[in-house]
Amino acid sequence: MKLLVTGGAGYVGSVAAAVLLEHGHDVTIIDNFSTGNREAVPADARLIEGDVNDVVEEVLSEGGFEGVVHFAARSLVGESVEKPNEYWHDNVVTALTLLDAMRAHGVNNLVFSSTAATYGEPDVVPITEDMPTQPTNAYGATKLSIDYAITSYAAAFGLAATSLRYFNVAGAYGNIGENREVETHLIPLVLQVATGHREKTFMFGDDWPTPDGTAVRDYIHILDLAKAHVLALESNEAGKHRIFNLGSGDGYSVKQVVEMCREVTGHPIPAEVAPRRAGDPATLIASSEKAKQELGWTPEHTDLRTIVEDAWAFTSALGDRSHAAKKKA
């Protein structure tokens, strides 16, 4: 298929683009590089630099596109609380612009990068797709709003669509991994201590109702996540909007992640306990049974050591090319 991938220079988007290319698809990427990395763009992909709102109409007007994978979005939870106006514009307005351009040019196949943040603070785990959606921040709220929009476009206009709600994406695929200027994810933050770009890491709360007192999360390997996008694109049905949770189904605590990073890197990695962060749930674990049954998707890299080893191979190879190193310099 001839595909458009928005945000294809980002962490998840670039790996998904690479995997789509490996499966024989023709990939065009739109990215404005507000957070993406040029080095992450697959060599065989066509790149168009620009904002989706500004260029998507012209790109799709070329004709021949058979599907879209939409990653382009703001995705920092804390920032979304401080700047909700920017999130509502950059996430929701952009998605609506894309949906209307797709409709205008007869592109009827969509996979949308949604998030577990749509669920907010769940009362029970594992989280299934039929649980209440109660986002606690603008990031989750904007993604949920886009999910609603996609549902209505599917019903009214016959759009074939899938929303994939990611849990904690981690790991690396070859020379593509997490290398953001503003890092918020646990594993890359901890590994930056091992590379000397940070003095220590923080554990936000050690009094959670979990086995070791630290928060528990479900980590999904980036390659497993990318493969789910391929399966979704190749099985979408007109007039239907499917929603799937994507996680490993296993939970690891912050302490377990820090200790695994110590084992893999051979670095002591000082970890300091800090106060809990408002809005953080004690435990977030996905049920991906629906994706396994309906998509035929099964995560293959669920072991925490494998995820950390892949992330460390990428992080340690970055050296002074990392955002952390550039900022320090």
UniProtKB/Swiss-Prot annotation:
Stated EC number for the protein is 5.1.3.2
Top-rank taxon of the source lineage equals Bacteria
Report the enzyme's class at the first EC level: isomerase
Question: Which residues are noted in the entry as NAD(+)-binding?
Answer: 11-12, 31-36, 51-52, 71-75, 115, 139, 143, 167
Residues of the active site are: Y139
Cofactor(s), names only, from the UniProt record:
NAD(+)
Q: Which UniProt keywords apply?
A: Carbohydrate metabolism, Galactose metabolism, Isomerase, NAD
Gene3D superfamilies cross-referenced by the UniProt entry: NAD(P)-binding Rossmann-like Domain (3.40.50.720), UDP-galactose 4-epimerase, domain 1 (3.90.25.10)
Where, by residue number, does substrate bind? T115, Y139, N168, H185, L186, F202, M203, F204, R217, R277, A278, G279, D280
Q: Which InterPro entries match?
A: Epimerase_deHydtase, NAD(P)-bd_dom_sf, UDP_G4E
Q: Name one GO biological process term.
A: galactose catabolic process via UDP-galactose, Leloir pathway
What reaction gets catalysed by this protein?
Answer: UDP-alpha-D-glucose = UDP-alpha-D-galactose
Q: Which Pfam family, giving just one, matches this sequence? A: Epimerase
**Pathway as given in its UniProt record:** Carbohydrate metabolism; galactose metabolism
- Output one GO MF annotation: UDP-glucose 4-epimerase activity
Q: What function does the entry list?
A: Involved in the metabolism of galactose. Catalyzes the conversion of UDP-galactose (UDP-Gal) to UDP-glucose (UDP-Glc) through a mechanism involving the transient reduction of NAD.
PANTHER family under this entry?
UDP-ARABINOSE 4-EPIMERASE 1, UDP-GLUCOSE 4-EPIMERASE
Name the family the entry cites: Belongs to the NAD(P)-dependent epimerase/dehydratase family.
NCBIfam families, per the entry = galE (TIGR01179)
Indicate the quaternary assembly: Homodimer.
Mind telling me what this protein is named? UDP-glucose 4-epimerase
UniProt source species: Corynebacterium glutamicum (strain ATCC 13032 / DSM 20300 / JCM 1318 / BCRC 11384 / CCUG 27702 / LMG 3730 / NBRC 12168 / NCIMB 10025 / NRRL B-2784 / 534)
